[in-house]
Curated annotation (Swiss-Prot):
The keyword Secreted applies. Expressed by the venom gland. Has the structural arrangement of an alpha-helix connected to antiparallel beta-sheets by disulfide bonds (CS-alpha/beta). Disulfide bonds join 11-64, 15-40, 24-45, 28-47. It holds the Pfam family Toxin_3. It is found in: Secreted. InterPro entries: LCN-type_CS_alpha_beta_dom, Scorpion_toxin-like, Scorpion_toxin-like_sf, Scorpion_toxinL, Scorpion_toxinL/defensin. Belongs to the long (4 C-C) scorpion toxin superfamily. Sodium channel inhibitor family. Beta subfamily. Residues 1-65 form the LCN-type CS-alpha/beta domain. Beta toxins bind voltage-independently at site-4 of sodium channels (Nav) and shift the voltage of activation toward more negative potentials thereby affecting sodium channel activation and promoting spontaneous and repetitive firing. This is Neurotoxin Cex10. The modification Cysteine amide is found at residue 64.
């Protein structure tokens, strides 16, 4: 599946260098996530080819610090 990586807080894993981004690419390709490629899009790490079990944004019942 494709999607934004998400923190336990419910926020997207943020990034600042838009487009090709080594940090996002490395995060997406971690073994437990299984992604094939990652880049920075709208200041969040977006991954392609993630394992179905990898949580992606938005998380149910988590709104990134908003109540």
């Amino acid at each position: 599946k494709d999607g934004y990586l998400v923190e336990v807080t419910g926020c997207k894993k943020s990034c600042y260098k838009l487009g090709e981004n080594k940090f996002c690419n490395r995060e997406c390709k971690m073994k437990h996530r299984g992604g094939s490629y990652g880049y920075c899009y709208f200041f969040g790490c977006y991954c392609e080819g993630l394992a179905e079990s990898t949580p992606t944004w938005p998380l149910p019942n988590k709104s990134c610090g908003k109540k």
